[in-house]
Amino acid sequence: MHYSVLLQESINDLNINPQGIYIDATFGRGGHSKAILNRLTTGRLIAFDKDLDAISYARENFQFSNFEIVHASFASIYDYCLQHSLLGKIDGIIMDLGVSSPQLDNAARGFSFTHNGPLDMRMDVSKGITASQALEELSVDDLSYIFKVYGEERFARKIALRIKDYIQQNGSISTTLELAELIRATIGKKEKKNPATRCFQALRIYVNNELKDLEALLENILAVIKSGGRIAAISFHSLEDRIVKQKFSALINPKQELNRITKMLPQDSSQIKLKWITKKSKANEDELNQNVRSRSAILRVVEKL
């Protein structure tokens, strides 16, 4: 079953205007979209998702006249709003940056290191390279960098060397458990977390261009939102949260130094201002008991002045 993490908190903090125009940047299975639609009267909602399964689900289950689903990355939200004369007219944006439960639980998608399936990991299976292809094409140095930066993996180079050696001997790594077992055999189990966790995260981020897409969205987000409009971001790992926090902070306090990861201070910072609505919120005990995956979720909400 799919749970939308921090659902009530994020929707409440968006302060929904029943006549407003809203964007769900990550439709998933529509938990946040449904909650927004329930609060709209003459307003409308535009949702984005790269996952064709999510698009199919939306078209089957969200047949509302004030709802539109767009098969695209949230990085294209600015371009969409530009093309549809919506720049500066959006009342709020919700982005739930986590991988959805249906994606994780469906072994055929290749995201899980506990269920065997093809090593794919693409959010949009209609294009791009699979995780298996990425492992074959990337050099040891590039693979090590991805594991270290995107996965914060201490043994990045050791794992990268083992993977490339394995591929040289066997031709490819084609399944999720094949990769997970190779990582476990390389570094052992040194903590409670599955030893493949960080590398799978890193590979998923790389295959789906996740951080660059997030940067692209945040780079132009204030041109999309109207004055008084709000942005709610739910992140699930430190890299995402760091980008969100530092971008928001830079727009609230433009004098702070450049973010070493994103380099994204606004060009004319004196003209751009936000205020915090929720600086940091985490799932409460009830939600943690319902959905263990919510334990790492962080909600941050800002308002454009």
UniProtKB/Swiss-Prot annotation:
EC number: 2.1.1.199
Cytoplasm in keyword set: yes
Pfam families found in the cross-reference section: Methyltransf_5 (PF01795)
MF-aspect GO terms: rRNA (cytosine-N4-)-methyltransferase activity
InterPro entries documented for this protein: RsmH, SAM-dep_MeTrfase_MraW_recog, SAM-dependent_MTases_sf
Keywords from the named record: Cytoplasm, Methyltransferase, rRNA processing, S-adenosyl-L-methionine, Transferase
One Gene Ontology CC term in the entry: cytoplasm
Catalysed reactions listed for this entry: cytidine(1402) in 16S rRNA + S-adenosyl-L-methionine = N(4)-methylcytidine(1402) in 16S rRNA + S-adenosyl-L-homocysteine + H(+)
Class of this enzyme: transferase
An annotated GO BP: rRNA base methylation
Binding annotation for S-adenosyl-L-methionine: 30-32, 49, 74, 96, 103
Location(s), subcellular: Cytoplasm
Function (record text): Specifically methylates the N4 position of cytidine in position 1402 (C1402) of 16S rRNA.
Family according to the record: Belongs to the methyltransferase superfamily. RsmH family.
Protein name: Ribosomal RNA small subunit methyltransferase H
Species of origin: Francisella tularensis subsp. novicida (strain U112)
Lineage of origin: Bacteria, Pseudomonadati, Pseudomonadota, Gammaproteobacteria, Thiotrichales
